[in-house]
Amino acid sequence: MYGRVAITALAALSLGAASPPPEHGGWIDNTPETLAALAKSCKGKDGWADPAPPSHIYGNTWYVGTCGITVLLVNTKAGNILIDGGVPEATPMVAASLAKAGFSMRDVRWIVHSHEHFDHVGDLAELKRMSGAKVAALAPAAAVLRSGKPDPSDPQYDLLIAKPMAPVTVDRVLRSGDTIRLGGTVLTARATLAHSAGSTSWTWQSCEFRVCRTMTYADSSSTISADGYRFTDHPQRIAAVRRGLEVMSALPCGILMTPHPSASGMFERMATGQLFDPQACGAYAKSAVARFADRLATETGTAAPKPVQ
């Protein structure tokens, strides 16, 4: 068993004979107070290396990232899965959060990611070294991880090239729909190629006291770029973005989490107990569709003029 969660007497009484959450770990229960602590600690801060306290989200899923970058730990009876890593400066913070939550880096068996930009995978080589875990990624992301260099076709290439990464050995190349199976937990990878060529969203089931939720880690939906890049010069990229957002909108959805917490109001939803929302993924993707349409309209000169203030 890889850690135990504390169960309050009140929760045990209210749930009668229900079994405790299976095999999930650590010393922090997901009470309103602990969920609110993360939002309070990060209020006014969203730096990629701003330290944040670990937080138990639901069932076997934990937040062990920083104020600005999500890192998730999924705990199983056969070891743990880490989703995303962060910038190199955040590596000791992620390791410390795991320890504070009652986990060990040595128990991480797999490392996967959302997309292949340095703010989310810049420290994967070191996390792999520390844990001995295997790394899995979609083919476009695997190429970037193995080389440590960004994809030249990435809209953000001119920004990313200034931030080279330590190369990472990729142990398994995934296709959309493939799964990572560990200790009875199944993570499903889906290519949602809006933000990058290797953008990956993940879904899995997490249960507490016989109440199971779909956990949905939807990748970044933004279509930002380096100065001078025009999506309208790259019709294949436009098609990939539209298809990616379409897939994202249709993801099985229960508890939405995103690589940048602020992109989905993640901390605020945790603090107010409003995490479960089957419509959240569709709304998240819909807003991105509108923003991308605005971007294309601006590029083609067909954007509606802004009202005079």
Features from the language model and the residues they span:
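Bacterial N-terminal signal peptides that target proteins for export
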Residues: M1-I7
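Bacterial Sec-dependent signal peptides at the C-terminal "C-region" and cleavage site
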Residues: A9, L13-P22
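C-terminal regulatory/interaction regions
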Residues: P21-G25, P278-Q309
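Active-site HxH/HxHxD metal-binding segment of metal-dependent hydrolases
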Residues: H24, T61, E89-P92, A99-T179, ...
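Metallo-beta-lactamase
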Residues: S41-K43, P51, H56-G59, N80, V87-E89, D107, T169, T179-L182, ...
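Conserved beta-strand hairpin/beta-sheet module of binuclear metal-dependent hydrolase folds
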Residues: G47-A101, M105, S201-T223
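Divalent metal-coordination and catalytic microenvironments
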Residues: N60, V74, D84, V94, ...
